[in-house]
């Protein structure tokens, strides 16, 4: 992420987002980069400090690779045009540093502004801290977030790892329509 802070790249990114109706999506390590840059949750490249959200090591202290169920918590983004609040998706995750953490004030702001995009949920479709469903222990079961204007989205789940013959033995809706 540090090379994206170079003035030429940072200016080009901000021009894309602010003047050319651009969108950015970061999945897994891409989400980590967007958070470290400040593009999510702030919508701009900025210096980060202890008052800012971040992604860190999974609570279990090791890599997790499996399918989880997520729930759409907000559709305040162009990325979610084909989704509805409450939609459930079964998606693969594969990470060792995917736990979203945030100070109380930052978390409250994300929730109040509708920037919590998706959350890990249990079998009843409810956000949970249970490690059986929330694979990294993310606060408020957060799997993905938006920038304030929704143009930038970051998420841990690998929605791109799907196909006609992928995960056929795993129940659930694997189609998360972000690219439509």
Predicted regions span which residues?
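C-terminal and late-domain segments of enzyme folds
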Residues: 72-180
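Cysteine-nucleophile active-site neighborhood
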Residues: 1-78
